Amino acid sequence: MSGRAGRHGLADDAQLTMHAAALIRLGARLQMLEIECALPREHLVRLYREVRGVAAPKGLLPSSIDWYMTWLANIHASLFHNIYRFLRNQAGCPRLEALVKAYTLYAEQGDATRRALPLDLTRALPLDLTRAWMLVRFVDAGVLDIARCRDCGAAFITYRHALRRHPVCVACRLPARAGKRAVAAPQRATADTRHARRQDARTAVVACRDGSTTTGGASGERHAV
């Protein structure tokens, strides 16, 4: 028996396997599972294929802290980390359990918001599980920090050594074009519908002017009078 396996009993391994399966369903990468679950790599590879039905993807983990400073990513990252911090500090959840529950709640909130607003439901949430996990690690390592907005009092993600002494969150100082891309797809669909209606109206006007009637709908056949 290996040293890693000897440190866990069967009950501990079963619990770690359940946590790993939950993380895989949320989109965890294999590197993340190896660090958080402390299970043999071969076991995690088999578990990933069993849960997802495909082989685990390869590639480097995201390592940029600047990504979290863009306005949309910062809002989502701040929302997730507030949930995570509540589960850790107030609810007393262990780190791995808090990570799973926090991301699940964040994803549910994000899906509910996208259904309530005219947003593109086919697009993924800005903050995937890997970036959420890296956010927790960055904050724990002191690379990123939590600040309080001087206007609304909300806690948000910022640089550890930010130059602003009185920071303001992104929600209180949204950029001018914030949200334009989010509603672009519904707007394009509405524009296409308006264009089609204008074309149908032109067809009807031409039909009346030429002394003919239009039947069978907007794109129906013309019958001379």
Swiss-Prot record:
GO terms for molecular function: DNA binding; zinc ion binding. SUPFAM superfamilies: FlhC-like. The keyword Transcription applies. Its cofactor is Zn(2+). GO terms for biological process: bacterial-type flagellum organization; positive regulation of DNA-templated transcription; regulation of bacterial-type flagellum assembly. Its main location: cytoplasm. GO terms for cellular component: cytoplasm. Zn(2+) binds at residues 149, 152, 169, 172. The keyword Nuclease does not apply. It is found in: Cytoplasm. Coiled coil: none annotated. Belongs to the FlhC family. HAMAP family: FhlC. Functions in complex with FlhD as a master transcriptional regulator that regulates transcription of several flagellar and non-flagellar operons by binding to their promoter region. Activates expression of class 2 flagellar genes, including fliA, which is a flagellum-specific sigma factor that turns on the class 3 genes. Also regulates genes whose products function in a variety of physiological pathways. This is Flagellar transcriptional regulator FlhC. It comes from Burkholderia lata (strain ATCC 17760 / DSM 23089 / LMG 22485 / NCIMB 9086 / R18194 / 383).
